[in-house]
């Protein structure tokens, strides 16, 4: 092969640093800079298998992810991909078949149902897609309920806080109304107020803007922004592209697997299944400045993704003629054209680079299975160009 062999990559991402002791720590987590640099939520190798009359169905397949304080994370995927199941693992609405979940210093599988219920009430604000409020209680009473359940704040403080939260979502004139007396969008807003009642460090929402008009949805997104600024961690399952664009981080789930975030970031326009196939076949490389990555001997890779750093394309005299920055895609045709012209493709001078490389054989296999990916690659092949915001130096 013309590219150097990849070094051994540590698999620390798939392990929780220390096996946490199962314990009944049901206090409230910190959501401030006290936890800076440390994940607030750690999920490791989560599997969820359901037994049905038709046999076993695996909804989650080895999911591992970290979520940090102050992140607004959107989780997207097709219906049935595992989005809601993933949230249910965090909220305890369902339990994983195997794997570990650590939130703060609390090992969730070590909690009994009653301990989990108390812990959840203090640490998670949950906005469901359906069945939001108790129909026999007013919006005010629904918002007070989590504070009553967890014995947080004094009774007068609970009512004051509930009224303030309902005003925050524009429902100050409807506090005494029953859920059946207001619109679906207003019920959704009241559910958001209720989720914030105990000032939890983590907000989990399943389609929080699904029943809202555009104006109210914008208000909810602004509210989420304010919560994130205060250090809250917000996880949202959504089909709404506006919500996904608003998030600081987007996870794609497909067939129960999380798609590699670098691939979904660089190739957002191809199908989720294509992203997953690329993630399965890609090989990781890390290279230092000065190392020539490709040569004219052996097989040329079908596609290269620049994950971190910058690749320089240089003439034989060392002059840089083009660059491929983080987020770039380089087709085999561009690499061949550069090599034939006597150019070298090397890491930039500012530091090491990280690449994902896919062989020509695997690339062709993916192209035959995905129309959107095939069209994208054919366009790159015809143009013999680098797909990125980087441009040939000197060109407009």
What are these regions (language model features)?
Residues 91:
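Helix-to-loop junction immediately C-terminal to a conserved catalytic motif
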Residues 106-107, 144, 148-151, 155-173:
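Conserved ABC ATPase "signature" region
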Residues 121, 177-180, 197-198, 230:
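Conserved signature/switch motifs of ABC ATPase nucleotide-binding domains
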Residues 171, 175, 195-196:
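ABC ATPase C-loop
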Residues 178-182, 186-188:
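Conserved ABC ATPase signature
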Residues 203-206:
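Catalytic Walker B motif of ABC-type/P-loop ATPase nucleotide-binding domains
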Residues 263-316, 324, 330-332:
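Regulatory nucleotide-sensing modules
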Residues 319-382:
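Cyclic-nucleotide recognition modules
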């Amino acid at each position: 092969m013309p590219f150097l062999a990849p070094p051994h990559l540590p698999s620390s991402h798939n392990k929780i640093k220390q096996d946490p002791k199962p314990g009944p720590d049901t206090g409230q987590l910190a959501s401030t800079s006290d936890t800076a640099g440390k994940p607030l939520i750690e999920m490791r190798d989560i599997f969820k298998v359901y037994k049905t009359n038709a046999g076993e169905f695996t909804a989650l397949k080895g999911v591992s992810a970290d979520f940090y304080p102050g992140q607004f994370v959107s989780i997207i995927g097709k219906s049935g991909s595992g989005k809601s199941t993933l949230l249910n693992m965090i909220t305890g609405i369902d339990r994983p078949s195997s794997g570990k979940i650590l939130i703060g210093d609390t090992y969730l599988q070590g909690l009994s149902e009653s301990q989990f219920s108390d812990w959840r009430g203090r640490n998670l604000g949950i906005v469901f897609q359906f069945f939001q409020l108790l129909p026999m209680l007013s919006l005010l009473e629904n918002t007070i309920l989590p504070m009553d359940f967890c014995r947080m704040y004094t009774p007068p403080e609970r009512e004051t806080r509930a009224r303030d939260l309902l005003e925050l979502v524009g429902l100050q004139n409807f506090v005494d109304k029953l859920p059946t007396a207001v619109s679906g969008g207003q019920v959704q807003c009241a559910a958001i107020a209720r989720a914030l009642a105990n000032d939890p460090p983590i907000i989990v929402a399943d389609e929080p803007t699904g029943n809202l008009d555009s104006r109210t949805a914008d208000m909810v997104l602004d509210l989420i922004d304010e919560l994130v600024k205060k250090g809250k961690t917000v996880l949202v399952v959504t089909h709404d592209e506006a919500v996904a664009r608003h998030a600081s981080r987007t996870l794609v789930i497909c067939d129960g697997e999380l798609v590699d975030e670098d691939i979904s970031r660089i190739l957002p326009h191809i199908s989720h299944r294509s992203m997953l196939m690329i993630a399965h076949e890609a090989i990781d490389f890390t290279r230092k400045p000065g190392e020539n990555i490709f040569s004219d001997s052996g097989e040329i890779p079908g596609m290269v993704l620049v994950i971190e750093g910058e690749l320089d394309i240089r003439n034989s005299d060392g002059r840089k003629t083009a660059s491929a920055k983080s987020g770039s895609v380089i087709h085999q045709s561009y690499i061949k054209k550069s090599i034939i012209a006597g150019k070298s493709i090397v890491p930039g001078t500012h530091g090491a680079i990280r690449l994902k490389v896919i062989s020509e054989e695997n690339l062709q296999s993916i192209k035959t299975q995905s129309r959107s990916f095939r069209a994208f690659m054919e366009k790159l092949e015809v143009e013999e160009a680098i797909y990125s915001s980087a441009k040939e130096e000197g060109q407009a």
